[in-house]
From Swiss-Prot:
<keyword id="KW-0540">Nuclease</keyword>
<keyword id="KW-0819">tRNA processing</keyword>
<keyword id="KW-0255">Endonuclease</keyword>
<dbReference type="InterPro" id="IPR020568">
    <property type="entry name" value="Ribosomal_Su5_D2-typ_SF"/>
</dbReference>
<comment type="similarity">
    <text>Belongs to the RnpA family.</text>
</comment>
<dbReference type="InterPro" id="IPR000100">
    <property type="entry name" value="RNase_P"/>
</dbReference>
<protein>
    <recommendedName>
        <fullName>Ribonuclease P protein component</fullName>
        <ecNumber>3.1.26.5</ecNumber>
    </recommendedName>
</protein>
<dbReference type="GO" id="GO:0000049">
    <property type="term" value="F:tRNA binding"/>
</dbReference>
<dbReference type="Pfam" id="PF00825">
    <property type="entry name" value="Ribonuclease_P"/>
</dbReference>
<keyword id="KW-0378">Hydrolase</keyword>
<dbReference type="GO" id="GO:0042781">
    <property type="term" value="F:3'-tRNA processing endoribonuclease activity"/>
</dbReference>
<keyword id="KW-0694">RNA-binding</keyword>
<comment type="function">
    <text>RNaseP catalyzes the removal of the 5'-leader sequence from pre-tRNA to produce the mature 5'-terminus. It can also cleave other RNA substrates such as 4.5S RNA. The protein component plays an auxiliary but essential role in vivo by binding to the 5'-leader sequence and broadening the substrate specificity of the ribozyme.</text>
</comment>
<dbReference type="GO" id="GO:0001682">
    <property type="term" value="P:tRNA 5'-leader removal"/>
</dbReference>
<dbReference type="GO" id="GO:0030677">
    <property type="term" value="C:ribonuclease P complex"/>
</dbReference>
<dbReference type="InterPro" id="IPR014721">
    <property type="entry name" value="Ribsml_uS5_D2-typ_fold_subgr"/>
</dbReference>
<dbReference type="GO" id="GO:0004526">
    <property type="term" value="F:ribonuclease P activity"/>
</dbReference>
Amino acid sequence: MALPKDMRLKGHRTFNYIHKNSIKYHGKLMTFKVARSNPEILLSHNHTNASNNFRAAIAISKKVSKKAVDRNKIRRILQEWLITNIPKINSHKPYWLLVNLKFGDFCNDKNKLLEEFQNLMFKSRLIK
């Protein structure tokens, strides 16, 4: 299941803002970049709901897997975790999250991937 549109990050200005103004959290399998939201950047994308809600993006390079099927499977696993574990009450947090996966074989070890993802979510204080 994909992220709802109001939880997605889009546009190169948004990603440039995150790269410049983020706090980084490193794990063995992935890196989190968390930045305070800046809704003015989203106004250029004609978002009617450009509020300070929590938004996320998951970037998976070809170094992780050459097959798009595998990369999409990993992305769906992480997006599903976000949808089920970020309740509507928590969506008001004014943060943007960019998840970058480091190279490795994640297709066989879903539990390890989700455990690391959850640990970094706690470490970044996006969930309690």
